Each structure stands twice: as structure tokens, then as C-alpha cells.
Amino acid sequence: MTLLHWTLPLPAGYRRDDVIAFHGRDGEAVAEQVTPTGLRKGILLAGVPVVLDVAFTPDAAICQADIDGDGDLEAPLHGALLNILGLRIDPQPFAQLAAGDPLLAPLVRVNPGLRIVQSASPFEALTWAIIGQQINLPFAISLRRTFILQAGRQHGSGLWCYPEARDVARLEIEDLTSRKFSRAKAETLLRLARLVDEGTLSLELPASGDVAAMSQALLAVKGIGPWTVNYALLRGYGYADCSLHGDVAIRAALQKLLGEEAKPDMARTEQWLRQYAPHRTMAAAHLWASLQPPASDG
């Protein structure tokens, strides 16, 4: 076993509870375990099981990677930590943009320092988007757990590790459809995994950070549509300008914000969100948050 260590400074107003809540959604904790002051997450990286262990202090994240093997994994693991801690997108530029906005300024005041917490990798974000689309959250979490247990591997500590494309590509469709996955979801997951594993589809962004070519390549995969691509850009790549106009919750939040009787359609939502470019990801984050009940003072 190899151990790597980092101490990552946290910005003022960092919302650790949001990060812990995001990674603690699966009550059975097969691949993520959380406490009030930290988290552990299992991932496969270059075929090697790794557990990322994070302990929060008031101004830093004390991080350790427990690696079941060898390999030069320090740089990609540091990147995965930035992802799962929500440190990719700085919320301040959007907060400054929204400060004079009569609609969004109140949302930002209610949730100062709100961040986008990401999946550990683009592949995890894409597969989670496919798994969770058009079903309720508890069922989606259950299917995600099944997916991890079918395709992932256990770390020496016992924690399961989220699979990579190669692990998923080995599955047969019946491995998923016999466990409550629809055939369409199962086919899309295996299709994506096999394209990535064989090298036909790369999930690496170009050095320029241009997401247009990546978006088009993903849209060419049968079963992947604009919503899945935008969600992957947000949760997988930390792209700051995702337009989530196809998201039902975003449209519901906009309906509430505008005080209208019906949800705006996708075209109108897309047009409305354009005014917040190049910070539409954070606009979406605050719209999502506006649907949550206010925290109790007691």
C-alpha cells in the first residue's frame, strides 16, 4: 500500500457540510463514508483501488490517498480531490455578477459561498447522469449502488471503489437488466464504457479547455442527450458555463422565482439563463438550492 498526503487550504466561508451531504447520499455507504468532519471515497484509478480520506479543519482539508498498488497517481489524485471538495469553480465572480440582479441577488444572499461539488471523474459524472435520468433520487441511488457492486472493486479497507470504463465494459447487459436497470440505461452505460475503453471516445478535455468538441463527441453516443452532457460538464469537468435549461428542477425553480403558474419551457429557460453567461453553472446551483427548505435555526 502507498500513502500520499496533501493539505489543501480552504477559502473563507467554505461550506463543508454541503460537501459531506453530497457524498453521504447513499445510506448504505458502500463507496463513500461520511462523518460530521470528514469523508472517505473509493475510486479506481488506472486500474488501482484508491481510498481518498479527507478530514476537515476550520481552514484546510487534510487529505490522504490509500493506494492498493503502485503507479504515478499523485497528479490525478490531487485533481480528484479538487473535484470532490468542490474547489474547481470559484463562486465569487458569479456572486459579483448577481449582486445587482433583483431576482438572483436574494438567492445568493441566502446561500453565500455555495459551490458545485463534483464527482471524482468525468466517467463517474457521466454514468451517474445516465443512471439517474428520469427516475426519483432514492431509486437512482439504489441503482448507483448496484452499479458499483457489479463493476467496481473493493479496496483493501473494505470500501468499494467506483468503476472505470474498463471495469464497466466487461459487464454483460443482463448483469444490469436483471438488477432493475432498464434496457435503455444498461445499453447506454455499456456503450459509453466500451467506447472509452477501446479509445474511440476520449474523456480528456483539450489543453485549451474548449468543451464544444467534447460535447459533440458525447452527443454522438446513442442514448446521451444534451441534459446528460451538460450535467457531465458540470459534475465531471467543473465547467463554469453549463446551461441546465433541460433540467426539470431548474425550470421549477425559475417558475417559483418568477412567480408564474407554469414552468417555463426549455427554450425560454435557455434564453433566460443566457444573461448569466459565462457563469451559468453557478446560476443553476443557486436555482437548485432555492428549492430546498430553509435551514432551521433550532
Description of each model-found segment:
Residues 1-298:
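HhH-family (HhH-GPD) DNA N-glycosylase catalytic core used in base-excision repair
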